[in-house]
């Protein structure tokens, strides 16, 4: 079994402290001229609501950038409601905020978890994300997605270890290794590095994105919150110094096979469709027994079956 206690590193040129990537990831970094540091909190519904735009950016321009998730662990869970939704203090307020975010951005998000099994801290799920990343960057991405599904869709308290283990299983992680890493010095050190990076980059709200190119002397571009899709494409162009070429369109079935479990809004955003049209096309694949419809409280999800 791999031992991960010291697999962290700091980029002194940028002031970034983060996990070592595996060899394949290092090769990918060399091929891609940009990096996007994505500051999140696992309890943040607005971070979850950004998934459709992030997928569209990856599908259309993913050849130009690599994403690094930074857990903004210093931010208090209550502070996630600031910005557009100031003043939320009680559990009822938080549940209402989550419903409003669903209405605003379209990504299903069930705030009843605050009424049924309230969460007291984002520390444990943040630590779990770092533990998952010790099995590789893509393992961390898969785990983060499953953790969000458990929280925002299934109203499960992601501070509980049995729920985190379920996330690890569904993400295809080595569960025995994950359980050990969850209590390891390596995961704790990685989280401390993320907290330090958050502080050094003066990030006080999530989601926040910092775009870097391969010129370490050039400052990154920091963007906090949600903007129209074309703004992010323009930032890519500014950082690259040329107009990026959009990748050939991905078929709907290829997209579903790649991501396996997606919301109607994710399909609609990626393929520039209205929700009704997106669901019409998705239902055709259900009839072909290639998809399963999974209704949620505030919207539909679709699971790929082949």
Swiss-Prot record:
It is found in: Cytoplasm. It holds the Pfam family Thioredoxin_5. The keyword Cytoplasm applies. It comes from Halalkalibacterium halodurans (strain ATCC BAA-125 / DSM 18197 / FERM 7344 / JCM 9153 / C-125) (Bacillus halodurans). The keyword Cytoplasm applies. Keywords: Cytoplasm. SUPFAM superfamilies: Thioredoxin-like. This is ClpXP adapter protein SpxH. The gene is spxH.
């Amino acid at each position: 079994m791999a031992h991960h206690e010291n697999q962290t590193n700091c980029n002194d040129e940028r002031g970034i402290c983060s996990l070592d990537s595996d060899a394949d990831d290092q090769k990918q970094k060399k091929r891609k001229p940009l990096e996007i540091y994505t500051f999140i909190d696992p309890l943040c519904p607005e971070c979850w609501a950004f998934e459709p735009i992030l997928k569209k950016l990856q599908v259309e321009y993913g050849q130009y950038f690599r994403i690094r998730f930074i857990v903004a662990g210093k931010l208090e869970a209550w502070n996630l409601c600031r910005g557009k939704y100031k003043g939320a203090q009680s559990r009822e307020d938080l549940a209402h905020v989550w419903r409003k975010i669903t209405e605003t951005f379209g990504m299903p998000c069930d705030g009843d978890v605050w009424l049924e099994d309230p969460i007291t801290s984002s520390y444990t799920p943040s630590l779990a994300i770092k533990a998952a990343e010790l099995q590789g960057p893509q393992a961390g991405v898969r785990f983060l997605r499953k953790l969000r599904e458990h929280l925002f869709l299934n109203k499960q308290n992601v501070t509980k270890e049995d729920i985190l283990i379920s996330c690890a299983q569904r993400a295809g992680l080595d569960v025995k290794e994950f359980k050990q890493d969850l209590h390891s010095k390596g995961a704790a050190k990685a989280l401390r590095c993320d907290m330090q990076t958050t502080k050094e980059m003066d990030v006080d709200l999530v989601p926040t994105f910092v775009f870097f190119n391969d010129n370490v002397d050039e400052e990154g571009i920091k963007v906090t919150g949600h903007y129209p899709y074309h703004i992010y494409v323009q930032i890519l162009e500014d950082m690259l110094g040329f107009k990026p070429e959009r990748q050939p369109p991905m078929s709907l079935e290829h997209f579903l096979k790649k991501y396996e479990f997606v919301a109607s809004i994710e399909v609609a955003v990626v393929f520039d469709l209205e929700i009704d049209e997106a669901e019409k096309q998705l239902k055709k694949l259900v009839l072909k027994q290639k998809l399963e419809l999974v209704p949620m409280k505030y919207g539909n999800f679709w699971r790929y079956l082949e």
